[in-house]
Amino acid sequence: MKITKVAVAGTLESSDVQVRVQPFDSLDIEINSSVAKQFGEQIEATVREVLAKLGITAAQVIVEDKGALDCVLQARVKAAAMRATDEMINWEAVL
């Protein structure tokens, strides 16, 4: 999947995460979280895993974490990535 435009998913509410995805020449992940020292590596690993499953190798991803669970982070990354592409989505494969 190729990222062609800027897209955002999520909110800045407590227990949520806002993920911004935009075109970039390589894969760049920025994590802003009050729990980054404890969970920063896990957050980055989750983001990388979701992007790999979607076939994304070039994008800038900015994660503003407010204490979201892993499943919420996965959903937000997936939603932002799908909003940021012009490709047709195979919904049977995604769901």
Curated annotation (Swiss-Prot):
Pfam families per UniProt: ACP
Keyword Cytoplasm recorded: yes
GO annotations of cellular component type: cytoplasm
InterPro entries assigned to the protein according to its UniProt record, in alphabetical order: CitD, Mal_deCO2ase/Cit_lyase_ACP
Cytoplasm in keyword set: yes
Primary localization: cytoplasm
Keywords: Cytoplasm, Phosphoprotein
Subcellular location: Cytoplasm
Residue numbers bearing the O-(phosphoribosyl dephospho-coenzyme A)serine modification: 14
Function per UniProt: Covalent carrier of the coenzyme of citrate lyase.
Subunit structure: Oligomer with a subunit composition of (alpha,beta,gamma)6.
Family, similarity comment: Belongs to the CitD family.
Protein name (database record): Citrate lyase acyl carrier protein
Originating organism: Haemophilus influenzae (strain PittGG)
